Regions:
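Short, small-residue-biased leader/transition segments that mark boundaries at the very start
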Residues: 2-9
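Disordered propeptide/prodomain
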Residues: 10-103, 244-248
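Aspartic protease catalytic domain
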Residues: 20-57, 170-171, 314-380
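Signature of the N-terminal lobe/flap region of pepsin-like aspartyl proteases
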Residues: 75, 83-169, 289, 312-316
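Short hydrophobic beta-strand that contains or immediately precedes a catalytic carboxylate
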Residues: 93-95, 102-107, 113-115, 267-271, ...
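Cytochrome P450 catalytic domain signature, combining two hallmark sequence patches
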Residues: 119-134, 201-204, 243-245, 284-300
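Aspartic protease core domain of the pepsin/retropepsin superfamily
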Residues: 158-249, 338-380
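Extracytoplasmic, non-cytosolic globular domains
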Residues: 265-308
Length: 380
């Protein structure tokens, strides 16, 4: 069958000197405390407001993911955004010659590779090339600016040359690991880079015989969490892959899902966000239907679920015809006493659902750039 032939092709390439696919391990820090859910919402609004502004500036059209007036008003009213606790899934990449190791957040909700100056020094890389192009934009709570270089980049054994890298002039203050590796589609609307060089996955595809332009996330709290690049590792899977329809969004990875029977259309799958969120009233409607969940309203009007830690609710997503139950670890955003906080809440000013990393813990999630489709399978 197809699975066997794919494995056969992959296995036959193992002994060859180039890497057709590679796997790295991802790590995850402990869950944040409940207070940081507010910071998470704000970070997410800032992130997508930044995209919306760039989209408008480059196309003259409005990106309807967020209400820009609301996002700007929130930013002005609050001054400094509370720091998010670093609870991302991160992995290490190698940059430059000789290679410099940098921990990064792999972010399917953005498109550029930006590195903290503490982890990448282009002056120490023989292969770095200054593209003489500055970058300057907002990303989550950060004002990110600096110069764009091109250099060698490797994820495990899959390498690419002349990959554009934003070299930040300041450190990221703990709001990101050492940088962020954007994995959404690179378009003028969502990229902060005005350069012609290909992002990593396209450069790797052109320069190496990788099996497919794909990333496969298998996020496990217990056991090894992995990111496979360049092919699907079927040994990670405990069942068939269900493929979602072709993604027609030019910029973001989107899919329609059902959450406990509630239809959610065209949600953005964003591994760089730590929660599942959406329009405030829509999220409340879903929370109201979950057995064992108390719906709490914050002073700012947003809703979040709370539950007894001894009796976590059953959250299940149906995507591409297959149903996945989220683990009790995935749905837990922190606790106070014997009450746990659900990693799902509403966000005012947000018009679309954002399915963050808790959603991606449902099993193995594949992002295939060649077909513009996402695949979902249960993990071993």
């Amino acid at each position: 069958g197809l699975v066997g032939s794919e494995m056969c092709i992959r296995d036959s390439l193992v002994g060859v000197s180039f890497a057709s696919a590679s796997q790295i391990t991802l790590s995850h820090t402990d869950r944040s405390n409940p207070d940081s859910f507010h910071a998470e919402r704000r970070s997410l609004l800032n992130k997508y407001a930044g995209f919306a502004k760039r989209h408008f500036n480059s196309t003259g059209q409005h990106l309807d993911i967020v209400d820009l007036h609301y996002a700007d008003k929130q930013k002005r009213a609050s001054g400094k955004t509370p720091l998010r606790y670093n609870t991302y899934w991160t992995g290490s990449i190698l940059v430059g010659s000789p290679p410099q190791a940098a921990p990064v957040v792999f972010d399917t909700g953005s498109s550029d590779l930006i590195l903290d100056k503490s982890f990448y020094n282009p002056k120490k890389s023989l292969s770095a090339n200054n593209l003489n192009t500055p970058f300057d934009f907002s990303y989550i709570n950060l004002h990110v600016y600096g110069d764009i270089y091109s250099d060698h980049v490797a994820i495990g054994d899959v390498k690419a040359d002349n990959v554009p890298i934003g070299h930040g002039r300041e450190d990221f203050d703990g709001d990101l690991a050492g940088g962020k590796f954007g994995l959404s589609f690179s378009t003028a609307e969502n990229s902060g880079f005005d350069v012609k060089q290909d992002p990593f996955i396209w450069a790797a595809k052109k320069q190496n015989p990788i099996q497919s332009s794909s990333f496969q996330f298998t996020l496990r709290r217990s056991g090894k969490a992995t990111l496979n690049v360049g092919d699907v590792d079927h040994s990670e899977l405990a069942g068939p892959i269900s493929w979602a329809d072709e993604n027609t969004d030019k910029t973001f990875w989107r899919t329609s899902v059902e959450l406990n029977g509630n239809k959610i259309e065209n949600a953005i799958v964003d591994s760089g966000t730590n929660v599942i969120t959406g329009p405030n009233d829509q999220v409340k409607a879903v929370l109201d239907q979950l057995d064992g969940v108390w719906v709490e309203q914050s002073p700012d009007g947003t809703y979040q679920g709370r539950y007894s830690c001894q009796n976590p609710p059953n959250l299940h997503f149906t995507v591409a015809g297959q149903t996945f139950k989220l683990s009790s670890d995935a749905i837990n955003f922190g606790y106070a006493g014997d009450k746990c906080f659900l990693a799902m809440g509403g966000t005012l000013g947000l018009n679309d659902w954002i399915l963050g990393s808790p959603f991606m813990e449902l099993g193995s999630v594949i992002f295939n750039y060649d077909t513009r489709r996402m695949g979902f399978a249960k993990a071993r």
